[in-house]
């Protein structure tokens, strides 16, 4: 299948300057980015197509080769005039072969992409479970609004480096071998700024604290990262910006412990409710619900409230809330209450029914068997 024309992909004229090309690419990248169009193969393909077109047309040498030879001039799998891929001489060929050994092949030096940034965001459990929008402030480097990222004073432009002719690299030949290194004149940039911008001092970028609104999806957990494409540091001299990664950390909750999509909590139960049964109020993230406690409930028994956990960020399935019963021993008893408990104990012990204390009776019977085995 034949490739589309790069200028047609970006929707610009063949005479478009760097700024117009960059603006067109940004518009398409925002429109078709995979993060904005999940599970949409067509958008992903258009995003890749626009990215490829921008990578060629934003590079002066590659653009010149494309304008002259079309796709064959920039596709390494297609040979250009002379059979060496775009009319390369033997110096180019040997430089590509041996240059990797001595510091990189002879390639066009592109302006560096902006650095990625990380922002640590702390959320409450409720925010993580339900989702939330947060406004954050991020100190970063942004494109200079006076020179529009060129680094040159308004009305002027950067000049092609006379030493490396815009490649950003020079070759030092030692017999058969060619060693490639960064151009010492332009420091690998390929361009010289003779009249730098007064605001950014030739860097093309300035320090600024950006205010961003971040939408946190429901179901995130500690360790999850949210990528904001193009919100990192601005690239050098019009190169693409880096990305911003929001690192999520969920604070400890006073009641609930999260494990995956399930929540866990302990519910205190009076010893009378545990013995006779009843209902207790149980907290959930959606409000309180009443839980029926069966008779003879012991500490450690788990009760599952289905669908009261966390909705999965990926599958949408709802987790459960698991409640562990903790039978409370009454404290600060009056003399009358203590006497009543003693009467109850005497009644239980004198009934001859072992099932009144199943765990205690089982424990002491096990201890007796253990010592009988030792002495027998």
Swiss-Prot record:
Binds 2 Zn(2+) ions per monomer. CXXCXGXG motif repeats lie at residues 144-151, 161-168, 183-190, 197-204. SUPFAM superfamilies: Chaperone J-domain, DnaJ/Hsp40 cysteine-rich domain, HSP40/DnaJ peptide-binding domain. A zinc finger (CR-type) spans 131-209. Its main location: cytoplasm. It is found in: Cytoplasm. The keyword GTP-binding does not apply. The keyword Flavoprotein does not apply. Zn(2+) 2 binds at residues 161, 164, 183, 186. One of its GO terms (cellular component) is cytoplasm. Zn(2+) 1 binds at residues 144, 147, 197, 200. Keywords: Chaperone, Cytoplasm, DNA replication, Metal-binding, Repeat, Stress response, Zinc, Zinc-finger. It holds the Pfam family DnaJ. GO terms for molecular function: ATP binding; heat shock protein binding; unfolded protein binding; zinc ion binding. Residues 5-70 form the J domain. Homodimer. PANTHER family: CHAPERONE PROTEIN DNAJ, DNAJ HOMOLOG 1, MITOCHONDRIAL-RELATED. The J domain is necessary and sufficient to stimulate DnaK ATPase activity. Zinc center 1 plays an important role in the autonomous, DnaK-independent chaperone activity of DnaJ. Zinc center 2 is essential for interaction with DnaK and for DnaJ activity. Belongs to the DnaJ family. Participates actively in the response to hyperosmotic and heat shock by preventing the aggregation of stress-denatured proteins and by disaggregating proteins, also in an autonomous, DnaK-independent fashion. Unfolded proteins bind initially to DnaJ; upon interaction with the DnaJ-bound protein, DnaK hydrolyzes its bound ATP, resulting in the formation of a stable complex. GrpE releases ADP from DnaK; ATP binding to DnaK triggers the release of the substrate protein, thus completing the reaction cycle. This is Chaperone protein DnaJ. It comes from Tolumonas auensis (strain DSM 9187 / NBRC 110442 / TA 4). The gene is dnaJ.
